[in-house]
Each structure stands twice: as structure tokens, then as C-alpha cells.
Amino acid sequence: MKIIHKGLVEYLPTFEAMKTFNAGRNADTEDELWVVEHPPVFTQGLAGKPEHLLIRDDIPVVQIDRGGQITYHGPGQLVVYTMIDFKRRKTSVRNIVSALENSIIATLAEYGIEAAADPKRPGVYVGERKIASLGLRIKNGSVYHGLALNVNMDLSPFTHINPCGYAGMEMTQIADFVQPCPTPDEVAAKLTAHLETQFTPKADNNE
């Protein structure tokens, strides 16, 4: 699995690059993790409803092809796009989602933060507050899009939406629990290590 650090990049070109990568895959294409941050942007998934955008401001809204509803990306949030051929790995989308959740939970545990997935709601939570979001697109036996983990960011734009369609959803981030807060790059080193562990053949075959 190849890990590519892209830094702070605009959302729309990254979205187009994901689609291009997935469309051009073949049986020998190596899976990749893209580690990025984005300038402020709202992304509206396939299930998104306009009424979940509560306040219209100068933050752009991009309609995209992942599952789920509306979320926010901004600087200080660690985003990892998972370009994974799940058929070749003989695994399932559910197992991939679990691997993403488990990797986030293990990463947060390294910082002394107790987090958990919620079977009734997508994402990872600290208590009732959401600290990470997940969203995937399944196409041609592969997945793309991925996860977003709040590290040290301005959370106020989340109040302009119903995050992932949930009214009143409270958000949190690593900076609320750890000071000095690690940088997104420091968190990325731990998170990608856990992702690599989760996506070893042993993990893939543990269905």
C-alpha cells in the first residue's frame, strides 16, 4: 500500500483525481492512501438534502459521489482518502469501514482519548461528540473517499450544517483533549501505521 502526502490541497481537483485514479485501475494497481488537508469546503454526499445546510456563507459547497450527507473540511483536519480494491483483497466494504474506525480509535488511544464507533451512526465519537467522519464510494470493486479526523481546526463551520444529516450534532477534536496538540502530520504518521496494520492480508482475511 502506497502512502502519498499531498499537503493542503483544494478539494475539487482532489475529488477529480480520485475518480480518475479509480477509473484507471487494473488488477495490478497498487492501493493508495492519500493524506491531505483542505481549505474550507462543505461536501454534500449522494444522500444529502439542501435543508441540512443551515447557513449559507462564502464557504463553497461541492456535490460529490460518496455516500452520506453534508460535512465540512478545513485546515487542521486530517483527511485520508482510501483507494482500495476490496475485491482483490477478498474483503468486504463493511470490513473496510471497520478497519477505518479501528484505526482512528487506536490512533486516538495513543493520545489518551477514549473513542468508539456507533453502530447507529457513521463515524467515530468521544462520548456523544463526533471526532471523525467516514464516507465511501463503491465502484468497480474498489472504494475511494475515506475518513476525516478533527485534529486542531476551527469547528464553527460545523454549526452551519447538520453534520452528516444529524441536527444538533456536536463536534470535537484532538485539541480539546491534548495540549500541546499534535500537528495533523504527526497524527497522520500514527493513523497511517494503524491503517497499514488493518489492511495486511491477515486483517483482510479475518472476516
Curated annotation (Swiss-Prot):
How is this protein named in the record? Octanoyltransferase
Residues the record marks as site: Lowers pKa of active site Cys: 130
Cellular component GO terms held in the UniProt record: cytoplasm
Q: Does the record's keyword annotation contain Cell membrane? A: no
| Stretches assigned to the BPL/LPL catalytic domain | 27-203
The residues that hold substrate are: 66-73, 133-135, 146-148
The organism of origin for this protein: Neisseria meningitidis serogroup B (strain ATCC BAA-335 / MC58)
Catalytic activity from the UniProt record: octanoyl-[ACP] + L-lysyl-[protein] = N(6)-octanoyl-L-lysyl-[protein] + holo-[ACP] + H(+)
The similarity annotation says: Belongs to the LipB family.
Q: Does the keyword ATP-binding apply?
A: no
Where in or outside the cell is it found? Cytoplasm
UniProt KW keywords: Acyltransferase, Cytoplasm, Transferase
User: Which molecular function terms from Gene Ontology are attached?
Assistant: lipoyl(octanoyl) transferase activity
